A protein has these predicted regions:
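C-terminal amphipathic alpha-helical interaction region
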Residues: 1-108
Length: 108
């Protein structure tokens, strides 16, 4: 679901960045911070998706600690409903990095 789509969007953004860097050598430097933030967000999403899947399987098998697994599912849902937009924001910032920064002349 959300995690796979996020990881794929990140992979697509990095592939496009690598292709565009052939004609804009500064692009990777302008985008680096946001690529790293996006990577972190995508990996957090994957971790929460995995926790949700494990919790769902445990609950389906009648795990003794249902409250623990239900809480895991609640936290995973919170991540995707409230925090998941951060990945989209960072990927948008990576795309925005294609705009060249103006050079600032430093006073001697």
């Amino acid at each position: 679901g959300h995690a796979r789509a996020g990881l794929q969007a990140l992979a697509d953004a990095v592939a496009a960045l690598a292709a565009d860097a052939k004609t804009d050598a500064e692009l990777p430097f302008r985008a680096a911070d946001d690529v790293l933030f996006a990577l972190g967000e995508a990996l957090l999403g994957a971790a929460w998706a995995r926790a949700d899947a494990v919790a769902s399987a445990a609950l389906a098998q009648g795990a003794a600690d249902a409250a623990f697994y239900t809480a895991k599912q609640t936290r995973a849902r919170f991540h995707f409903e409230w925090l998941g937009a951060e990945l989209t924001h960072r990927l948008n910032m990576v795309a925005a990095a294609r705009g060249a920064l103006p050079f600032v002349a430093l006073a001697e």
